[in-house]
């Protein structure tokens, strides 16, 4: 399919490695700022000088509804150009670089629809105190970040995302502009969901006294205008940047911190610019109680009353929903972003089976601390099986359902289902190379099932976004990984030492220390 030079990105393709076989052998089927601190001197843009196409030869191609064995997949520019018999594809692309696909499987890149990358700092703490967090720290860790250290936390989260199979990530936070350049240079496909609120007296579920002691919300036109201006400025600067790899969506932070006017403005912005929008929804009991107390309705009904629900919206969490909420979300076609691993940490299993049945498309996200969508797929499968009341337990959902949620489901949420989410000719070349020759993956009656149930993120050998390798042979190409890890560890140790010096951390059920 012809594309203009503006649409055609440059590509960072590496020389053939020693394990790759010759074209003749393959045809014969023989044999088996802050960003500057964090990225390698020869980062992605410096590497992106080759114009060669790539053929993954004699490989397995996996999508949610099909597995094709011993085929080739060709990448030309930023698109998948062909899938078919290896000899035919190699003859069609005689100048392409050849990637030996024997013992490998190609999957669509995973899409993380809900991440808070700066919260990477809270690893080893935020998982174990419930939600809202019951630990009353004398000082909040994020308040101790200095200068560009917050961008450091964001970027270490992006590094984890790449290593665990993410190719598209939705960063949901306020002030994303501070980290936008660093995120763009990671090579990930990014959606910057700039989060805004206009309540001047309700801090949300993480406020020191919690929502239970909150007073009636007061809304500030000034805060609303400032938030909408941030969205507009971020959109103007970044939407469509990096050959379309960067998108900007508006986000209302929380139902309890949003006025009707803010909700309407966020949706209007999304419709004007033909993008999606997002919100945290029904993530805690205090949120539900607060909305009923001060607005007279549960959170989904409040959003519906003010025209916020709909198929452009992907709502994160939906943990505390009743039958009426589920029906309302389903009728509106609202997409639910399911953060299964974090939900399990919180001790809550959202009624995903009921939401599916009601008509809600499901996507996946990670939320805080970790950015591993592979883990999310496995936890989502197991927790949904446990929560269902099927006559024969353990049949639903299937691994194919989980892959669809994490790929095509995410593509629908970010309004890019025509170009992302599956391995099809004409779609973007956002893909993973899975090494199937691992002790925990062989033998395998169904390779996708084996990977979801038994696999590890380290099985991912290479990943590609827009036809460019961002990880190859388990080496991330867009960052100085060793330096990044060392810097993040140093900063984290300093901050947690200061937190513990300010007051003890009481672990539930354990002695104070």
Task: Identify the residue ranges that each predicted region occupies.
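Histidine-rich, glycine-flanked metal-binding segment
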Residues: 30, 39-43, 48-53, 61-107
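Alpha-helical scaffold segments that flank or form the walls of functional sites
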Residues: 123-188, 227-243, 489-491
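Acidic, glycine-enriched loop/beta-strand segments at the rims
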Residues: 48, 61-72, 346-347, 411-448
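N-terminal secretory signal peptides
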Residues: 1-22
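Metal-coordinating catalytic core of metallo-dependent amide/deamination hydrolases
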Residues: 181-319
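His/Asp/Glu-enriched, well-ordered alpha-helical/loop segment
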Residues: 305-312, 353-438, 454-457
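Active-site gating loops and adjacent loop-to-helix segments of metal-dependent hydrolytic enzymes
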Residues: 121-152, 159, 194-221, 285-312, ...
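C-terminal cap of metal-dependent C-N hydrolases
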Residues: 428-485
């Amino acid at each position: 399919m012809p594309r203009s030079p503006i649409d055609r990105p440059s590509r960072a393709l590496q020389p053939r490695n020693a394990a790759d076989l010759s074209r003749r052998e393959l045809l014969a089927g023989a044999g088996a700022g802050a960003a500057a601190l964090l990225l390698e001197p020869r980062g992605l843009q410096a590497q992106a000088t080759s114009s060669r196409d790539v053929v993954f030869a004699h490989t397995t191609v996996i999508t949610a509804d099909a597995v094709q064995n011993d085929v080739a997949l060709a990448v030309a520019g930023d698109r998948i150009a062909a899938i078919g018999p290896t000899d035919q594809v190699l003859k069609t692309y005689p100048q392409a670089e050849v990637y030996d696909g024997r013992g490998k499987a190609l999957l669509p890149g995973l899409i993380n629809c809900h991440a808070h990358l700066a919260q990477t700092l809270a690893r080893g703490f935020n998982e174990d105190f419930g939600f809202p967090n019951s630990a009353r720290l004398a000082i909040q860790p994020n308040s101790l970040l200095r200068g560009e250290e917050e961008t450091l936390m964001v970027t270490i989260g992006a590094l984890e995302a790449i290593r665990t199979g993410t190719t598209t990530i939705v960063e949901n936070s306020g002030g994303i502009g501070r980290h936008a350049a660093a995120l763009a240079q990671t090579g990930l496909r990014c959606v910057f969901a700039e989060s805004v609120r206009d309540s001047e007296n309700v801090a949300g579920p993480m406020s020191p006294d919690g929502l239970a002691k909150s007073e009636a919300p007061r809304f500030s036109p000034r805060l609303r205008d400032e938030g909408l201006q941030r969205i507009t400025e971020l959109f103007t600067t970044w939407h469509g940047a990096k050959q379309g790899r960067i998108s900007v969506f508006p986000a209302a932070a929380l139902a309890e911190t949003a006025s009707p006017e803010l909700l309407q403005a966020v949706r209007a912005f999304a419709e004007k610019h033909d993008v999606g929008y997002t919100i945290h929804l029904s993530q805690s009991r205090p949120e539900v109680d607060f909305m009923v107390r001060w607005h007279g309705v549960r959170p989904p009904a409040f959003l519906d009353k003010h025209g916020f629900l709909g198929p452009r919206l992907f709502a994160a969490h939906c943990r505390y929903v009743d039958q009426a909420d589920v029906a309302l979300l389903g009728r509106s076609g609202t997409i639910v972003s399911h953060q299964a691993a974090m939900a399990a940490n919180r001790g809550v299993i959202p009624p995903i089976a009921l939401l599916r049945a009601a008509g809600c498309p499901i996507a996946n996200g990670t939320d805080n601390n970790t950015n591993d969508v592979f883990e999310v797929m496995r936890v989502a499968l197991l927790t949904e099986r446990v929560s269902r009341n099927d006559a024969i337990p353990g049949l639903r959902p299937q691994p194919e359902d989980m892959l669809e949620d994490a790929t095509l489901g995410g593509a629908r949420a970010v309004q890019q289902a025509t170009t992302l989410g599956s391995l099809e000719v004409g779609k973007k070349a956002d893909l993973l190379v899975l090494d199937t020759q691992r002790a925990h993956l062989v033998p395998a009656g169904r390779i996708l099932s084996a990977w979801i149930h038994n696999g590890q993120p380290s099985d991912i050998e290479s990943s590609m976004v827009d036809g460019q390798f961002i990880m190859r042979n388990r080496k991330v190409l867009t960052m100085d990984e060793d330096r990044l890890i060392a810097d993040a560890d140093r900063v984290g140790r300093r901050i947690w030492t200061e937190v513990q010096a300010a007051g003890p951390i009481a672990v539930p059920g354990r002695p104070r220390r």
